[in-house]
Amino acid sequence: MDFTNFVGFDGKKELLPCGFDTFDSEVKLRQLFLHLSNFVLNSICHFNKYEQKNFAKIPLKNAFESKIKSLLPLHKLNRLNNFDKNRKFNLCSSSTRIINNYYNPKTSQRLIVNSKKLIPAAKLISHCFINNKMQLLMDKNLLFHEFVLEKLRKLHKDKEVLDLGDSISIKQKDVCALKIYTSWKNIQRKDPNIEKEVNHAINVIKEGDYNQVYLIYPKDNDFTRHIPVYVEELKYKTYQIKAIPYSLRSIIRKNI
């Protein structure tokens, strides 16, 4: 498997992005991953600011093990013959089996839990406990896309911000729509290496629905300003193509 576009962990092995901008340490890169993982895991769990800051100090495997533990109710390890029979529970057999297998498939203990509380824990286990091994790998381009999308929705509340899957569209009444493509790619200002993305932007403009296309990448030390792109074959059209740096620093600032 090619791990080039993935971040996360495979057992004790961590796949963190190369250091960039102010993300110059293992702790900051872990914190970045924990924050961005919320976009994919939002229906299962959420790492709050405190967890992001403190779990970043330990390996990602341990961080997710701690998160699973925090999602389980306090009575998770009660034996069948010791639990409070006067307390009512809605048992979820599938979730119970998942959690039992996660802790110890040979144990004689059985979990007596409230299914409403258990389901997130079981779902998280099913996402990151694969073949009896802790593992969670995510597409970094998807994570960056979701991060930019959330930022744009907060910034342009008076406009229509649409997630088109491979791109983002911003529409406003009586104004030509803007199309945005995101990519987690290290950009060097003198040699940005974005020919493929620019050619795609040219085709989008030629189709006529958009005259502005922005190519957004993570901000880095050598990529701090917009890079305008001029295209000879579009010189008689009104258009705008830009490569734009997008900062991820707010993730660190939020958790200080």
Where are these regions (language model features)?
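Catalytic core segments in nucleotide and nucleic-acid processing enzymes
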Residues: M134-I256
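Terminal, charged accessory segments of proteins
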Residues: M1-L137
